[in-house]
């Protein structure tokens, strides 16, 4: 038996068999997110002017963020399951391909046993999640990994990236990887991804001279004078530091050493936190959540005392499906599941951080 509701939401029926609500036939009047009728604000079915309202996406127009751009043509073809056989293999192994191009290491205890039983794929973690990044160059005698692959031994970059498939236990070895896809992704990121361009600039400087030491600074935030929602340029994402440098321990920027230093954790409040871990989902190196995103104050919208978008509100907006927004995220399959779990873990950590900081006991 299934519970179903009348169109006005007031009457409940017990219906035998399968319940089918059809496609999401409603859209938020502010951001265009698509919803089912049952997801509306309950008191709005006969609200002002008969307008049905939804708050799960943008809090009634308070949260305004840039829509995702259409992905580069190569990635768009790979994410289309009806395109060709190659795209189907890509979607099955999408987490493996993402691991090959990720700048950071995902630190989490992943429960692999849950998928040994029949049923749909589930991405489950236990405990805390964090992203870590190493040096620009590998230690002597060790192969390059993660961000180092954009800088070290790039003449053999394809081979180096595919060798990760054999070393990384998180790679889906049942489906394999295709060299043509890896080559295409390398070209695509070189042309489109601002983070990749910053690391390539470090490569060129390291390869063209013996200047030491060299560091790459990943900027936590853009200039306060920059338009809030404009696309970031490379100079707003990262900067190269040549010579001696005294690091400010209080700075939220991430300073990547040329060699050594071990793995360094990146704060989930850093604007590039997700783009560094999920280049497949953010092919242009788009910035993510950061502190200080203001609520929309246009029109008659009432804004509370806080006045800023929370991390939960940011991800609630980002995860919606909209008719006029690119579907790169929601076409990500298993990688999209991982991103959602990662985002929720960040939200929970941020809540705990607030409790600890504001504990008056």
What kind of feature is each model-predicted range?
Residues 1-361:
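Non-catalytic interaction regions
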